[in-house]
UniProtKB/Swiss-Prot annotation:
UniProt key word DNA-binding: yes
Protein location: Nucleus
Name by which UniProt lists this protein: B3 domain-containing protein Os02g0683500
Pfam family, one: B3
DNA-binding region per UniProt: 96-200
GO cellular component labels: nucleus
Record organism: Oryza sativa subsp. japonica
Gly residues biased stretches: 73-86
GO molecular function: DNA binding; DNA-binding transcription factor activity
Amino acid sequence: MEFTTSSRFSKEEEDEEQDEAGRREIPFMTATAEAAPAPTSSSSSPAHHAASASASASASGSSTPFRSDDGAGASGSGGGGGGGGEAEVVEKEHMFDKVVTPSDVGKLNRLVIPKQYAEKYFPLDAAANEKGLLLNFEDRAGKPWRFRYSYWNSSQSYVMTKGWSRFVKEKRLDAGDTVSFSRGIGDEAARHRLFIDWKRRADTRDPLRLPRGLPLPMPLTSHYAPWGIGGGGGFFVQPSPPATLYEHRLRQGLDFRAFNPAAAMGRQVLLFGSARIPPQAPLLARAPSPLHHHYTLQPSGDGVRAAGSPVVLDSVPVIESPTTAAKRVRLFGVNLDNPHAGGGGGAAAGESSNHGNALSLQTPAWMRRDPTLRLLELPPHHHHGAESSAASSPSSSSSSKRDAHSALDLDL
């Protein structure tokens, strides 16, 4: 491990630091050099040592200006020439991991080291080293990294400052990534070799899931199945089931006022809107939800008509009473009779009720005004006398009078 107290990083001052480090501050370099076999020449003159030191410094300085101790740190073969050509596999001891926070990779340009790990692996005498120490690390590719390690009294924390921002930028670290620190195993020289590594955070986000808060779009494609009403080759639209409550409400609020009736002149098209299906609709059992309103459009001579559908569109629902014998509803200028016996046969009554609720639409529904406005424009009750003659019942006179007044005139 190399400890220096200088904060100068120019080229000339860096060379002076390398010379001083070779004599004083890297003891494991001299130990390794003594343990290595001597070259062919046994000369130990100062000139020979100076030449070998300068050759080692020039070879290491050509790759990066901070590679002052990689002659011994990378290969462990001393500072002699040719030692850096061999890549030695070093056994490492894991020290600790640090999950970087947004402030660690932000604009503060510092990495906070947990106090328990800092005091255990990087002991620092703040009084003797006011400016901190320079720690040399190697990454997985063998590239050296130098960080200034110091203690901040203001926050009472151990931090790595200078050189850390360059590491974050090159490795593209983000908040949540993990930085791992380890050291070599073996003799004194191996234990002074420090290594740094990193790994990306585990991405648990589902790429197919939409971000929270964004509206869910309707499916762009729908599945079509043959629909057997009329035998005209129509299709039944089967939308996918709603995935969320928002999509369910979105489908309820669909509006088909921009529908082009000319495109539906040659076939039957089934649309779904926001009204409710009446309970007497046996042909619409395949509807995806009882909250959808289905009706069909067929071409006709005077416009688009709703053919064979028991759906009441944009009108006041007719509430059947078991005490009434007959009802007449005037919708869109057409009188519709709905005879229904109080206790008569269920099948015949249901069939007649289905035929009675079928509407012929003279104009498309999307070209009319809002039905809530039409309710406010009901005509005066001047047709009650004409329509009371159409209601007949074998019950008492009071019942006949009540039936006559129950006939609705919705001349829309």
